[in-house]
């Protein structure tokens, strides 16, 4: 396979070239204008950030992206799917409110904001890919219906995947709530009876008649009928239907790669990642710990696998910040250049396994050429 081209822009600015200008120049040089954008519904997949977390990509970048896409005739919209865990982004109403609090709205972002899997995370399409782990990933409908996919990725650590980049944003981020259950879980859901109030919503909406209320009006799952679709987890507002067992990091990354294939199947796509505010954990937390390395730059590519590998390599090569962060406290007199910082922080994770699987199933290549502009 030919080397993928990954384009890199540093963060140095001048009075005639600010960071937004540099991002636009990077995108154009990397070939975003070659996409069939005219009259296309173009999904800009971005993480709006859990309220309290300040490491997410600023809405200014999203607005510049939307305006650039519109200049090519596209109909862009910002989008994300609801979360599996209970929080401020587990349903569309709270999710949109959270996005607005963090600066993402039609005025500031210069385009509409759409929660792709609907009000309660149950609006999705199954995309058949014949995957080894996920035969038919459940993708949020607004993303499945989009003509073109653009991912804007904050590159940072992740406590289960090792790091979060393009594949994490695509594979996990575009999954419906039930899809996220398939990604995370190694078994069927269970009922935390102490939280169940007997509201009956899971019983009414189980497509497989696998749930009933017992004599104590607590939900019970018939595992001979349960297919592990996750609808009960998506619908329960009381943390009563929950994930039973979490999958390993390696299998999670395999599944993320396969979900990414489903998201991008038969669609033109393009990706940009920001190595800024590289926090040790994901933006789903309501806080962000201190950055572990200096801000490095922005990278863009048509190949999400090459993009993730290039970002990982740059972080590995970078020195650790000697400030009060999780790595500096343990390695006070070391610069850690050449060290796998994500594995040092999360030793039970294996991010490289996901990239290898993504390469194996044809999503992209880890063999890249870094082009500095």
Please give the residue ranges for each predicted region.
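Extended, low-polarity segments enriched in aliphatic/aromatic residues
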Residues: 2-53, 57-61, 67, 72-80, ...
């Amino acid at each position: 396979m030919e080397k993928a081209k990954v384009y890199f822009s540093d963060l140095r600015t001048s009075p005639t070239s600010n960071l937004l200008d540099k991002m636009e120049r990077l995108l154009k040089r990397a070939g975003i204008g070659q996409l069939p954008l005219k009259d296309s519904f173009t999904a800009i997949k971005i993480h709006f950030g859990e309220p309290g977390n300040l490491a997410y990509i600023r809405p200014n970048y999203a607005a510049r992206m939307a305006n650039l896409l519109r200049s090519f005739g596209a109909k862009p919209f910002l989008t994300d799917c609801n979360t599996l865990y209970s929080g401020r982004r587990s349903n569309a109403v709270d999710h949109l409110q959270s996005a607005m609090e963090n600066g993402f709205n039609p005025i500031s972002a210069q385009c509409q904001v759409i929660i792709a899997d609907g009000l309660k995370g149950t609006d999705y399409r199954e995309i058949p890919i014949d995957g080894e782990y996920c035969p038919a990933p459940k993708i949020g409908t607004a993303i499945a219906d989009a003509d073109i996919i653009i991912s804007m990725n904050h590159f940072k650590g992740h406590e289960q995947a090792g790091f979060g980049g393009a594949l994490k944003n695509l594979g996990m981020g575009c999954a419906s709530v039930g899809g996220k259950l398939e990604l995370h879980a190694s078994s069927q859901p269970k009922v935390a009876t102490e939280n169940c109030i007997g509201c009956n919503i899971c019983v009414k909406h189980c497509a497989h008649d696998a749930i009933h209320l017992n004599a104590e009006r607590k939900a019970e799952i018939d595992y001979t009928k349960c297919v592990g679709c996750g609808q009960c987890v998506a619908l329960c507002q009381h943390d009563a239907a929950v994930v039973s067992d979490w999958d390993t990091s390696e299998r999670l990354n395999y599944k993320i790669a396969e979900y990414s294939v489903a998201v991008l199947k038969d669609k033109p796509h393009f990706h940009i990642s920001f190595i800024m505010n590289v926090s040790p954990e994901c933006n789903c937390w309501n806080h962000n710990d201190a950055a572990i390395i200096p801000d490095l730059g922005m990278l863009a590519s048509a190949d999400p696998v090459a993009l993730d590998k290039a970002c990982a390599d740059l972080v590995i090569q970078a020195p650790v910040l000697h400030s009060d962060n999780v790595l500096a406290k343990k390695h006070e007199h070391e610069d850690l250049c050449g060290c796998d910082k994500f594995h040092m922080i999360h030793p039970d994770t294996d991010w490289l396994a996901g990239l290898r699987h993504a390469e194996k199933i044809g999503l992209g290549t880890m063999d890249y050429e870094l082009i500095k502009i």
